[in-house]
């Protein structure tokens, strides 16, 4: 998994559910997935870690 969209779809979440789960505005998720902005690497790794620990991916 190399992108936010990969993480989100692996967890079976919509953009809305993913944004609510992490407390990140939905528009930010849309911008990351659409390529308008880049998710910071440290944040991507933290989100991946949390999803793995929660057993969602």
Where on the chain are the PLM-derived regions?
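Residues within alpha-helical segments
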Residues: 9-12, 40
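A short, Lys/Arg-rich alpha-helix, primarily the initiator
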Residues: 1-9, 45
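Secretory-pathway ectodomains
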Residues: 3-4, 21-25, 48-52
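DNA major-groove recognition helix of helix-turn-helix/homeodomain DNA-binding modules
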Residues: 41-57
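Short alpha-helical DNA-recognition segment
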Residues: 12-30
């Amino acid at each position: 998994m190399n992108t936010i969209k990969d993480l989100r779809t692996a967890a079976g979440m919509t953009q809305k559910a993913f944004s609510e789960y992490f407390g990140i505005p939905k528009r930010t998720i849309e911008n990351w997935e659409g390529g308008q902005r880049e998710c910071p690497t440290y944040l991507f790794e933290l989100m991946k870690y949390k999803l793995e620990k929660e057993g969602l991916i």
